[in-house]
Amino acid sequence: MSGERAKRFPLALEDLKRAPRKSEGRAGERHAAVAGSKAADKPAAVLKPVAVKPAAVRTALPGSAAAKPATAPKPTALKPAMPKPAAPSVAPAGAFALTSERVRERMVERLRANGVTDARVLEAMAAVPRHMFVDPGLATQAYEDSALPIGHQQTISKPSVVARMIELAMAGRTLERVLEIGTGCGYQAAVLSHVARDVYSIERIKPLYERAKLNLRPLRVPNIRLHYGDGRVGLPSAAPFDAIVIAAAGLDVPQALLEQLAIGGRLVAPVGAQSGQHQVLTLVERVAHAQWRESRLDRVFFVPLKSGVI
C-alpha cells in the first residue's frame, strides 16, 4: 500500500477480518451470553391468550394451618335485601291463651276468697275464656271483677256476680235443664254449660243474639240452645227448668217464669228499680205447685228487664 493510501485508509483489509478478542468471563456467564444470543436470533413466539379460571375458595378446617390467600372469586351482584314485615303489635293467639289461663286462675282465687265455694262453679269459671266475649279493646280488662259494655246499652256481668248467681241456682245439685234470660254476649251461658246438661238462653236484641252465636261457635259448646225472643215470656216449650237465671232487673219476677220453674227448682234474679237503685239479688224457690219462697240477698246493679224484641 502506498504511503498516500495508507494515510487515507489507516486499517488494512486484514485488520477488518480479524475480530477483536473479548475479555473472557466466568463459564456460567459465557453460557448465558451464548444462550441469549441464540434466543435473540429466533423470532419471538406468538402467545395465545389463556383463560384464567378463578381459584376455588377453600375453607380452612378447624385447627388447620392458615391457608394461603386465594384469588378472589368473580364478584356476584348482590340483591337488595327485602325489608322484614313489622312484628304484630299484639301477642300471638297461643301466647295470649297461656296468659289468659294464668289470669283466669288468679280470677278464680279471688272468687274463692270472696266466698264462692262450689268446686264445679270455680272450675267452670276457670274453663271459659272471658276475653273471647268482650270487645278486643277491652280484652286486657276481661278478668277484672267489673262489668264491661257489650253494646246496645248492655253489659257483661262481673265474674263475681256470675259465679254467685250460678252457685245459688245450683245449691250443690246437678242441674239437668237451665233457662237463662238475657244471653247478652253469651258468657254466662258458656259457664252454665259446664254445670248443666242442657242450657236454654233467650235474647231480645237481635244483634246481641247474633253476636252470642259467633262468640260461642269457636268453643264448640254442644249443650247450649240460643233463642231470639222476649225473655219475660220464657220458653214454655222447654219447661220445666231446674234453674232459671235472669240477667236483667225488673220490678218483680214475671209470673210466666215462676210457672216454668220445676218444683224444687230455684230462680235467681235481680229485683228493683230499673234506674239501678235499690236492686237486690233475689232467690225464689218453688216449694209446691202454687207456692214459692223468696229470699233477698245482695245489693247488685243490672240493666233493666224489658219486654218485646228489637
Curated annotation (Swiss-Prot):
It is an enzyme of class 2 (transferase). Residues 64-81 have a biased composition (Low complexity). One of its GO terms (biological process) is methylation. SUPFAM superfamilies: S-adenosyl-L-methionine-dependent methyltransferases. Residues 14-32 have a biased composition (Basic and acidic residues). The active site is at residue 157. Pfam families: PCMT. GO terms for molecular function: protein-L-isoaspartate (D-aspartate) O-methyltransferase activity. It catalyses: [protein]-L-isoaspartate + S-adenosyl-L-methionine = [protein]-L-isoaspartate alpha-methyl ester + S-adenosyl-L-homocysteine. Catalyzes the methyl esterification of L-isoaspartyl residues in peptides and proteins that result from spontaneous decomposition of normal L-aspartyl and L-asparaginyl residues. It plays a role in the repair and/or degradation of damaged proteins. NCBIfam families: pimt, PRK00312.1. Belongs to the methyltransferase superfamily. L-isoaspartyl/D-aspartyl protein methyltransferase family. This is Protein-L-isoaspartate O-methyltransferase. The gene is pcm.
